[in-house]
């Protein structure tokens, strides 16, 4: 009877809760990396498990305490300041132009205002869907190739605004209905970035089928992993690199490499003090520091934070937990997108792009709540 009660409680766990997402994401990395774990070594493995446990517990703490994060204007103002700082700082690092940096922030704020005003209208989704398709077509025309089949183009568009616009617009619009989902899925595959495909798929499941049975979720996850493995193999073939690995072995090796990078970070005792997470394309410093060549390298969700701030990065994990709780209790569609982002970054590692999207989602959620309060006041 006791075992049955435990099983029933497990069944009641929300698989799409932020903490569940983070635990499942890291668990999948360890499962996939299992064939190669001997290469990391038992001692190093225990060390990275200890570090990850501290950060995940820190992330979990805000959800343990029975506190309700209620809206007040301070959240709106703080989210605005955070978004403004990250946007202007990042744009200035790239463009070295204060004018362009401010213009970039204004563009983001205009998009946020339009979202708050029209997000319930179908025309808004249709426009975003069209923008996503147009941005993809422009990439193909400008670079003269489909990124999935051309490795050089794929690497070139890593920081291309058109790619980010296309991916963001298609993920948001693609979870609205099946037709948009199928078209968006195909385009994101052709864009050549597995993270975009994963995010669309997970966001669609969370938003449309939140109460899906666990066994079906496992089957869908397995099918998605196989597909992402095949996609990774196609990308590798287009790079002219000779890897004698099948799609599943490729995923396993990629997961192992993420853990290997984390073990190198833990053993390095280097503190980069924000150079990785607060700088656009800061991930290439990981390769420079650990492997002596500048190259964008992924690790686990909190690996970059640990490299920047060491064990004190656990405080950031707690702050991320607080923000995640606020987004989780907010707009369901925005949370579906955030949950998919959180899962994807379990393998990538928190970076500047993640922080910008996080601050944008926080700001939009606060704006939505504020708009509802104003509406209630006006109706009184």
From Swiss-Prot:
It comes from the Archaea. Coiled coil: none annotated. The chain crosses the membrane at residues 15-35, 45-65, 75-95, 98-118, 123-143, 182-202, 217-237, 303-323, 341-361. Pfam families: O_anti_polymase. It is a multi-pass membrane protein. InterPro entries: O_anti_polymase. Keywords: Cell membrane, Membrane, Transmembrane, Transmembrane helix. It is found in: Cell membrane. GO terms for cellular component: plasma membrane. This is Uncharacterized protein MJ0420. The lineage of its organism: Archaea, Methanobacteriati, Methanobacteriota, Methanomada group, Methanococci.
